[in-house]
């Protein structure tokens, strides 16, 4: 992409963010003179007390989003926006996984609101990844699957990542190998093997998602995995598994006897 194209994209992004900021300000201004402001403050306090006294399980999904949005745009009633967001994305999980640009496009939201939502996902993923990084992968397998599902199940494009492991199956690097369209991301055997050698990896785990939601491996997935496994075997690099993530669950090619 040339400089003019990059500049154009930057301008479009800036315009989208500016538009979102204006939307947040207008929403707040429209609600600042609301006669029910005292009720709103009381409602916020009750929501906060329920959270502190009984934990997150005491709140419905839209109430969790409502509370988050109150932190970003505190002068308005955020319940209608929260309900609209849950309805639009279908679930709290899908909302948290939505990309920032998609969030900013929603009525009443802007960069501040989007960042408030995304930081929750970032914190959740960081928490889920801790045991994966602290223990040998094969000893923390369920933790790995939980982390991968939280991170990838709701992606709208196909993403391929590779987990590179040392001889003790400790994670060396977790890298995105490629991203593609709705249902296609290229995986290049030579590049993955070369990267394994560069990192001194003794083993790898392949991971990719199916945006369709179906985690069952395709024939192409199986053939490509076997090709990488054969290439790695010649150089002493094991392919422990190929994990496929979908909204309906997770598939392991190793568990299915496909590698």
Regions found by a protein language model. Name each.
Residues 183, 226-259:
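Divalent-metal-activated hydrolytic enzyme cores
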Residues 11-17, 24, 212-214, 220, ...:
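Surface-exposed, charge/polar-rich loops and edge strands
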Residues 179-220:
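Short HxH-centered metal-ligating active-site micro-motif
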